[in-house]
């Protein structure tokens, strides 16, 4: 099957300035992400960035770059700019990999593309089971609940579904009903065009989760359990050191 990978790589980062160019064992982080994307079998891979130094690093590694504006409010808006500049047809399948995921398994990049291709929805994503109580109650770990057909009912930073009887007695064990959302998305290009035409939703602004805009406007997001659990993403200097050690 045919699909395109777009990797947004914003240079500015409050917790880790110049994040895409941080060195991981001799290569910039964005190059590690690019290499993982290549292993997925994507037909085309584009790094979308607002900074010339990131563009130079990607081009030096033989990658394709699309320069984007620096004032986008979300990663999806940056994707939409690339979709328009590259004039992708509405049925083109696009997988969005974050530029701070140097350990993302190539298999799940392809998985989300294949799931979208076999679904009637315009958007697809992945999740993994939560086994750790600390993660279950951590608002930085986004949870998702699905319906019987594998479509998202809701995403939240809260602990959903709330196991009333279990949690009334103890929060040390969590059962097997919780899923953590992974920030990888597949879209049809036409869906991205529609998404950015919608006003931000109240739920999205409360939870600070832009995927809630899709549910607010009555659209569906296909969710599947990831074939592999992705490694550590990089948000902080501590994350960066962990990834360096794991990839050494």
Swiss-Prot record:
Reactions catalysed, as given in the entry: 3-deoxy-alpha-D-manno-oct-2-ulosonate + CTP = CMP-3-deoxy-beta-D-manno-octulosonate + diphosphate
The pathway is: Nucleotide-sugar biosynthesis; CMP-3-deoxy-D-manno-octulosonate biosynthesis; CMP-3-deoxy-D-manno-octulosonate from 3-deoxy-D-manno-octulosonate and CTP: step 1/1; Bacterial outer membrane biogenesis; lipopolysaccharide biosynthesis
Q: In this entry, which stretches build a coiled coil?
A: none
Q: Which GO terms describe its molecular function?
A: 3-deoxy-manno-octulosonate cytidylyltransferase activity
Provide the primary localization.
cytoplasm
The family database entries (SUPFAM superfamilies) matched by this protein are listed as: Nucleotide-diphospho-sugar transferases
Subcellular location(s): the record lists:
Cytoplasm
Superkingdom of the source? Bacteria
- Per its UniProt entry, what is the enzyme's top EC class, as one word? transferase
What is one GO biological process annotated to this record? CMP-keto-3-deoxy-D-manno-octulosonic acid biosynthetic process
- Enzyme Commission identifier(s): 2.7.7.38
Q: Is Nucleotidyltransferase found in the keyword set?
A: yes
Query: Which keywords has UniProt assigned to this entry?
Result: Cytoplasm, Lipopolysaccharide biosynthesis, Nucleotidyltransferase, Transferase
Query: Which GO CC terms are listed, alphabetically?
Result: cytosol
- Spell out the family assignment given in the record's similarity comment: Belongs to the KdsB family.
Its annotated function is as follows: Activates KDO (a required 8-carbon sugar) for incorporation into bacterial lipopolysaccharide in Gram-negative bacteria.
Q: Sorted alphabetically, which PANTHER family does this protein's record hold?
A: 3-DEOXY-MANNO-OCTULOSONATE CYTIDYLYLTRANSFERASE, 3-DEOXY-MANNO-OCTULOSONATE CYTIDYLYLTRANSFERASE, MITOCHONDRIAL
Q: What is this protein called?
A: 3-deoxy-manno-octulosonate cytidylyltransferase
């Amino acid at each position: 099957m045919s699909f395109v990978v777009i990797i947004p790589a914003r240079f500015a980062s409050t917790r880790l300035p110049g994040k895409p160019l941080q060195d991981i064992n001799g290569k910039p982080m964005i190059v590690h992400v690019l290499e993982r994307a290549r292993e997925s079998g994507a037909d085309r891979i584009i790094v979308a960035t607002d900074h010339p130094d990131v563009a130079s690093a990607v081009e030096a590694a033989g990658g394709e770059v699309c320069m984007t504006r620096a004032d986008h409010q979300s990663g999806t808006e940056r994707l939409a700019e690339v979709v328009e500049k590259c004039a992708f047809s509405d049925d083109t399948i696009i997988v969005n990999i974050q530029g701070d995921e140097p350990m993302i398994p190539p298999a799940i990049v392809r998985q989300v593309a294949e799931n979208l291709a076999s679904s009637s929805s315009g958007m697809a994503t992945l999740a993994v089971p939560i086994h750790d109580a600390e993660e279950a109650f951590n608002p930085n770990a986004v949870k998702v609940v699905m319906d019987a057909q594998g479509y998202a009912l809701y995403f939240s930073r809260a602990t959903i579904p709330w196991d009333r009887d279990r949690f009334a007695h103890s929060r040390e064990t969590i059962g097997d009903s919780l899923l953590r959302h992974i920030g990888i998305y597949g879209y049809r290009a036409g869906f991205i065009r529609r998404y950015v035409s919608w006003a931000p939703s109240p739920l999205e602004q409360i939870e600070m989760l832009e995927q809630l805009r899709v549910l607010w406007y009555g659209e569906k997001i296909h969710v599947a359990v990831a074939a592999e659990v992705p490694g550590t993403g990089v948000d902080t200097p501590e994350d960066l050191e962990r990834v360096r050690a794991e990839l050494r």
